[in-house]
């Protein structure tokens, strides 16, 4: 039932996927806590502590049916979330109550869960980036040879191709993918470290047997699916980990904003558009409007994501000695919402990249309006071959280009540079001779080949290795 009398995050109601929302949900968090308590009990039993199979079986029987009401009521009394859930779990598991959380500190479940959740979230981000790359690969291949204007300073420069421009977007997303893969590979559990990272409580439990303590930690690590634990820590793992992870995710915001901005500008030129639904309304006052609202939303969310990375940066710097609680409130907002923002951006990118619309005739017309300027050097070389003076012709072309530009800008008329060159006896060229130099395909360089090589050498290996992530389709809520 909808709740209209309280604030609910737009990430939950409008933007983020159910999958990402579940990853950062209380249910996923507290179920992971219970998995960690079970893993600890098993590891401690294996090293000789008095823990029975019956106790472990009882813990496993209730690992998913969390008695939230009991935990909530207890937290109101003791003001401690971890001990409230230890208590609630103990109510369900009376035989195992005495060995839950044995030797551990709150950060055993809190920090280890945060690392596990970050890995799950990174893997979902990774999956969706690959889906976007797959969509753009098809687009780039289809349009790899279609000439279009290239821009520097947002002014027409030379020509590129529609597909080649798409590879620029893809290359940045590929860079994000590499960084996210790096962060996944570097993630390590906090492990079993005790209250200030010294493992003092486990020294007491195992009578100073370091080998057993290290074995417990390695066992827990393996049970949770990790290859390593942090080598040293205070009460928490270093908050630089959060900064590194969110920085990688925020890189996606940069790439997405650049791509979405390009599409918005191209929509203004009427060369390309994002998908537009049959019943979509662009403006309440202007029925003809086709606003690039999805790409605008990508840009809006990307700004949020890029700024959000400042939170873990400052949090990392304010951790005094072994730990303060400066991190907790900020971290639970910044990390979750950073990933939710990235997820929302990727949902829109998946939708947009799956339905980009190109208008070839507009693209061609805009090319042909500028091509006479771009072809001036070729025209000059042809006239030189017929006996013209290179320096004189260069000056004549400059004068014609300035005059033709004035006609376009001041009079709103078509570019008449070709007619000016044809009428200038210094060139001695017929219209047919001039127009042979006006094939757009001759001005795109190796664009089509570059697309082929990029897709073959960089993108296709990624798609082949992650075939299950190709072909994703997203329906947006709004």
How does the language model describe each region?
Residues 2-200, 206-221, 282-283, 293-297, ...:
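A helix-coil-helix interface module used to build multimeric assemblies
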Residues 21-25, 70-72, 280-300, 322-337, ...:
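Short beta-alpha connecting loops at secondary-structure transitions
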Residues 137, 141-163, 273-289, 322-329, ...:
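Glycine-rich cofactor-pocket loops
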Residues 236-271, 280-341:
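A conserved active-site cap/scaffold subdomain adjacent to cofactor or substrate pockets
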